[in-house]
């Protein structure tokens, strides 16, 4: 078993085209011995957003703090908040935005993309 102290993990700015004011911690990943899944913690600052994008794998999301807008494959926005979870199917376009006044945080669990090759 591997136990990490999440407060000690750095949260660098996401350097992906289309992302703005987003930081991400990798809480559990290959460096921890997890060959199949990766757990990430995203922080979307007020006015920030992830890119509108898709993947060829499914993933699950749990809202940790604050509120945000989950944009679906049709471009429709859905307000989401702490206590909610989302499932994103392979190929679904999606995005997260934060038009609110506090940081929006969520966990995102994905398969290890290297294993999908």
What kind of region is each of these model predictions?
Residues 51-52, 70-71, 88, 94-100:
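Short beta-strand His + acidic residue motifs that chelate non-heme Fe in jelly-roll/DSBH
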Residues 43-45, 55-70, 109:
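Short, conserved beta-strand element in jelly-roll/cupin
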Residues 48, 56-57, 76, 92-93, ...:
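A generic "binding-loop/recognition-motif" signal
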Residues 40-55, 90:
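Conserved short histidine dyad/triad with adjacent acidic residue
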Residues 74-90:
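Short acidic-glycine-tyrosine-enriched beta hairpin
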Residues 1-36, 117:
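A short, N-terminal "cap"/entry segment at the start of jelly-roll beta-barrel domains
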Residues 41, 60, 87, 102-117:
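A short hydrophobic beta-strand segment most commonly corresponding to one strand
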